[in-house]
Amino acid sequence: MPRRQDLNSVLVIGSGPIVIGQAAEFDYSGTQALRVLKDEGLRVILVNSNPATIMTDPEFADATYVEPITPETVEKIIAKERPDAVLPTLGGQTALNTALALDANGALEKYGVELIGADVDAINLGEDREAFKGVVERCGAESARSVIVHSMDEALAAAEQLGYPMVVRPSFTMGGLGSGLAYNETDLHRIAGAGIQYSPTSEVLLEESILGWKEYELEMMRDAKDNVVVVCSIENVDPVGVHTGDSVTVAPALTLTDREYQRMRDIAIAVIREVGVDTGGCNIQFAVEPDTGRVVVIEMNPRVSRSSALASKATGFPIAKIATKLSLGYTLDEIPNDITRKTPASFEPTLDYVVVKVPRFAFEKFPAADPTLTTTMKSVGEAMAIGRNFTEALQKAMRSLEQKGSAFSFARPAVEPGPNTVARLVSKTEETTTERLRNVQRALLAGATVEQVFGATSIDPWFLDQIQLLNETADLIREDPDLHPETLREAKRHGFSDAQIGELVHLDESVVRGIRHALDIRPVYKTVDTCAAEFEAFTPYHYSSYDRETEVAPHEKPSVMILGSGPNRIGQGIEFDYSCVHASMVLREAGYETVMVNCNPETVSTDYDISTRLYFEPLTFEDVMEVVEAERRTGGLLGVFVQLGGQTPLKLAADLKAAGVPILGTSPEAIDLAEDRGEFARVLTEAGLRQPKNGTAHDFEEASRIAHEIGYPVLVRPSYVLGGRGMEIVYDEASLKTYLDNATEVSPSRPALIDKFLEDAIEIDVDALFDGRDCYVGGIMEHIEEAGIHSGDSACVLPPITLAPDVVTRVREATEAIARGVGVKGLINLQFALASDVLYVIEANPRASRTVPFVSKATGVQMAKAAALIGTGRTVAQLRAEGVLPADHDGTTLPEGTPTAVKEVVLPFARFRTPEGTVVDSLLGPEMRSTGEVMGVDKYFDTAFAKAQAAAGGPLPTSGSLFVSVANKDKRSAVIPVKMFADLGFEIVSTGGTAEVLRRNGIESTVVAKIADAEGEEPTVADLITDGRIDLIFNTPSGGQAARGDGYQIRAAATSVGVPTMTTVSELGAALQAITAQRQYSWDVTSLQEHEQTLRERAAQEASRD
């Protein structure tokens, strides 16, 4: 069937900010979709609120709307653009729910727009728990016994029928949000209550426990001719009970019998047909009872999902790309395979390798959170590895996590473990925590049997045998300290790193590497080709293995290598992948062969056609150096970029240079200079710049002396970290001692850095480019919150709205002086604080920052592309002349009338609960906790801020009640904004002390009891919030460590029910402006292309006046 000719324009709904359960994989999927639609000659319209995505680059769509993904806003875009169709299946749950709302409110019918990729009936059948249960029954398959409920009374009645434990699954949520395992009535009240609230239809499925069953997924595609393919089978190593996003997974499924697989396949094909997905992909999850082989269907996603990205990277089959073509009317047999160029998409991929995905968690950011893994997803990222066998892939994936202790350790204890020790270790394997797989390996190493560990974990014995095989291989290595060739080859075939081998034979990693190279034991690089080498592969997508024959083809000119950022984590996310992708794209355009090294299956950078060659490898020195050597052997290497992927590649810079690898852009020496307190202070002194008083301490006595000299409060942090890891504001000596006692986990070989904390300062962020001579300031961002909240968690605005022109000039001059003094060649990010009109330098990061995408979108200048070209020898002057950078202005001299852009963050507190079941404290501080960001852009700040809040999931109310409870230090500054809220007609609710201050200033408020002071049936503020009687909260914390008192319980209640909460006076002021604007007029929607046109016109007008 040819492409539908009645479609001329398509609106794609993106997934919005990166959140747990819906992350970078939707940028990968969406970018593929946009490229397909453009190639087909369609007018492409995109709505996505996330500026850190590649898909929101203006070049990928004809009209790119960085606007809130709400039904109201998307309807405005439809009314303006009048698309023929909406494609909602590539933006995760956000896009699906928005599409359903547009159908329900009549907007699609009103404007004559159809859904493509999946229709409303198919979405409802796949997502509605009760409807899907009927689908499964009609297909002759089984679901787990279950009951649908819409209230707690119904849930309690269902519990008597199903019995405990049972699984709670809300409808229409993502990443298992609101789901869990209820072992008793208390659990049921807590989990089902949250689930009913999180489900947009207030619907929850209560399901019989199938804990301990084996869990599988099938990635399916179906076209309009009823051709169905199974793209990939995925098996969870963890049994049912741990969300698939938090489980170690493997592709293809390894422990299914052929009979079980065929049964599962038959069910999946019947289900996709019955649901009616006929122009796209879907994901179906199964559970198999290990003793009887009974198969039940768990759930279905009638859209491209998180697993689709993994399956695409695992197989080389671009699911999102093909799903988009199917939505346009093509059939699978009409779509060519990009990799082989000979087979159609109707050929199911065949794998001659094993893929393992391991999740990455961030519990260190939420120390109060319960680390138990359940059906609610908690991981913030993932790493993937490919090997010729399971053990090789598993070990490569584990070391790709880059976390201390993430790889297996095979050191045996000095004393042989006794029965009690073994029993204790086996007992630990029952705990479903992030340590589970390592606990399994330790128990087996100590002498536990596979049967014992299987009894404790329900992990399939085949996987346990493989882990036991690793322990046995470790013993072989231990018994051969001379490292004979057979031993080394065997170790490498099972994925042992040089560091692991060195640990076993008491040799340094470099010595092991020297022995290995002397024996010519090196990896070869195989190709992901979708067909198990049956046809030639035309896309060089490689993975390492200690096999015989390499498949890296010779190349004619030296390559440029870009090191990616590895698995997403808090502090290092999609923003860094953005810079890597831009560098690869612009360098290819400039005629270079580019090589990407990364291990993150979610990202655009690991798409097989972004770079000339892709190596899916861990970002360790050993693995990167082997790729370097492979490139050198087949055509040469110009150099390596380490400044684009965040802290991960930066940590490798010095070792790579020492090994003779040319580093492109900023040198390792300059990187170290910026981190070295003494050297950096010298640069600032020479430039006449000031820092907050500071010192460097190696022990508590030194730290105590420095803190007393500087004066409390002080900001304490380790060196060489990203995302404020381990950073804390300390108010007294006891807190300082507690911090240092715990800080060794953060960066053991580095001293603690101590700074005077500047209270009430305005924080300023700058992204700039320097070529050794000229500086281009990309943007100056003013933080909306005062200093003290990590820049990655703070809302900011560009251009700045309260900085005087002379401050902007001082910032610009300081930026250039620091870039020159440090010796930057490429990007630099600087943070300043303005206190009492004195400009202080907080820190300099000579690399791509997380704000580069935001600055690029806000100003229309591709900063990462410019940085890559500077790294290969171009100058700022040349880039201005070529139009890569503006010829007549930079981020400090933006034309008058430049739109205002606000960046707001998205926080994951609703995902994390304490062991008692309460939400963790949402109080922000100097350690970063946000997972993603959104952008609001408009002519004026007030509307841009309102858009950003709506996009982040916390739309501001225009009426209702405002609860106010502020610390003593904030009471004076809070009076005026609270008075203005009262004047707008908001009911003011406050606690006793705050109420008295407000009353003395002529502001009447309803007094509510503090939680600790409530008597009898008297409602507390937490009760009012939970009951929906509070619409906005203003709660500033007292100094010192936040007590688990009223403040915490107020914030926890607000997080649970999603009430917008302001914790600083400046944030309340911004909210006041936004609410006032919203009450006066409805905002317009404007595409980035229109904003850029306005910028060009304004710049031209100003240039002509000059």
From Swiss-Prot:
Details of cofactor binding: Binds 4 Mg(2+) or Mn(2+) ions per subunit.
Q: In which pathway does it act?
A: Amino-acid biosynthesis; L-arginine biosynthesis; carbamoyl phosphate from bicarbonate: step 1/1; Pyrimidine metabolism; UMP biosynthesis via de novo pathway; (S)-dihydroorotate from bicarbonate: step 1/3
Binding residues annotated for Mg(2+) 4, in chain numbering: E843, N845
Q: Which residues form the ATP-grasp domain?
A: 133-328, 681-872
Tell me the residue numbers annotated for binding Mg(2+) 3: Q831, E843
Keyword rRNA-binding applies: no
Give me the residues that bind Mn(2+) 2, please: E299, N301
Provide the MGS-like domain boundaries.
954-1106
Keywords (A to Z) from UniProt:
Amino-acid biosynthesis, Arginine biosynthesis, ATP-binding, Ligase, Magnesium, Manganese, Metal-binding, Nucleotide-binding, Pyrimidine biosynthesis, Repeat
Q: Which domain of life is it from?
A: Bacteria
Q: Where is this region: Carbamoyl phosphate synthetic domain?
A: 551-953
Per its UniProt record, what InterPro entries does this chain match? ATP-grasp, ATP_grasp_subdomain_1, CarbamoylP_synth_lsu, CarbamoylP_synth_lsu_oligo, CarbamoylP_synth_lsu_oligo_sf, CbamoylP_synth_lsu-like_ATP-bd, CbamoylP_synth_lsu_CPSase_dom, MGS-like_dom
Q: What EC number(s) does the entry state?
A: 6.3.4.16, 6.3.5.5
One GO cellular component, as annotated: cytoplasm
Residues binding Mg(2+) 1: Q285, E299
Q: Which residues bind Mn(2+) 3?
A: Q831, E843
Where do the record's region annotations for Allosteric domain lie?
954-1106
For domains, the record's comment is: The large subunit is composed of 2 ATP-grasp domains that are involved in binding the 2 ATP molecules needed for carbamoyl phosphate synthesis. The N-terminal ATP-grasp domain (referred to as the carboxyphosphate synthetic component) catalyzes the ATP-dependent phosphorylation of hydrogencarbonate to carboxyphosphate and the subsequent nucleophilic attack by ammonia to form a carbamate intermediate.
Q: What does this protein do?
A: Large subunit of the glutamine-dependent carbamoyl phosphate synthetase (CPSase). CPSase catalyzes the formation of carbamoyl phosphate from the ammonia moiety of glutamine, carbonate, and phosphate donated by ATP, constituting the first step of 2 biosynthetic pathways, one leading to arginine and/or urea and the other to pyrimidine nucleotides.
Q: What is this protein identified as?
A: Carbamoyl phosphate synthase large chain
UniProt source species: Kocuria rhizophila (strain ATCC 9341 / DSM 348 / NBRC 103217 / DC2201)
Q: What is the lineage of its organism?
A: Bacteria, Bacillati, Actinomycetota, Actinomycetes, Micrococcales
Primary gene name: carB
